[in-house]
Swiss-Prot record:
Job description of the protein: One of the primary rRNA binding proteins, it binds directly to 16S rRNA where it nucleates assembly of the head domain of the 30S subunit. Is located at the subunit interface close to the decoding center, probably blocks exit of the E-site tRNA.
One of the record's GO cellular component terms: small ribosomal subunit
InterPro entries, alphabetized: Ribosomal_uS7 (IPR000235), Ribosomal_uS7_bac/org-type (IPR005717), Ribosomal_uS7_dom (IPR023798), Ribosomal_uS7_dom_sf (IPR036823)
Protein family (similarity comment): Belongs to the universal ribosomal protein uS7 family.
Name of the protein in question: Small ribosomal subunit protein uS7
Gene that encodes the chain: rpsG
Top-level division of the source organism's lineage: Bacteria
Keywords annotated in UniProt: Ribonucleoprotein, Ribosomal protein, RNA-binding, rRNA-binding, tRNA-binding
Quaternary assembly: Part of the 30S ribosomal subunit. Contacts proteins S9 and S11.
Gene Ontology molecular-function annotations: rRNA binding; structural constituent of ribosome; tRNA binding
One Pfam family named in its UniProt record: Ribosomal_S7
Length: 175
């Protein structure tokens, strides 16, 4: 909470390939030491690998019945957004000191914070995976998130479990 004035949010330009602000934010989260072109290469490569895997899964489910191909760029973005939605938390716990005790108070997460947390968790989970190369790690983690499994989804489940366990302290909320 600023003392002087509210600081305006910086406008993020959409990414050059898919024209998506969400993807541009994700690239910025993935970026290390200002090397954006490398982060873009990793992200776009991971998305193409993810798209191939999803198409293979859907083709196996349909048993070869072709329904027509959807727009590649739109399909990839939909898969990415669905993976991100599966990781985004809706509640989290925050420490609140009351008297001499510190309580973990469950609080609802704002929309923009939940997106940021989801992106951060996906990147962290991808970095700890065992595959060779960040592109394959990120593709694997995005696929796991798309299928509602994996480390990032587990992190969200743990956060929700913690909030559920501390529901008794919800009346200590300060807003």
């Amino acid at each position: 909470m600023p003392r002087r004035r509210e600081v305006p949010k910086r406008e993020i330009l959409p990414d050059p390939k898919h024209h998506s602000e969400l993807l541009a934010k994700f690239i910025n989260v993935l970026m290390v030491s200002g090397k954006k072109s490398i982060a873009e290469k990793i992200t776009y490569g991971a998305l193409s690998v993810m798209e191939e895997r999803v198409k293979k899964i859907k083709k196996n489910e349909e048993d070869g019945s072709e329904t027509g191909s959807s727009g590649s760029a739109g399909a990839v973005l939909r898969y990415f957004e669905e993976a991100l939605d599966n990781v985004r938390p809706s509640v989290e716990v925050r420490s609140r000191r009351v008297g001499g005790a510190t309580y973990q108070v469950p609080v609802e997460v704002r929309h923009d914070r939940s997106i940021a947390l989801g992106m951060r968790w996906i990147v962290q989970a991808a970095r700890t995976r065992g595959e060779k190369g960040m592109m394959l790690r990120l593709a694997g983690e995005l696929m796991d998130a798309y299928e509602n499994k994996g480390s990032a989804v587990k992190k969200r489940e743990d956060t929700h479990k913690m909030a559920k366990a501390n529901q008794a302290f919800a009346h200590f909320r300060w807003n």
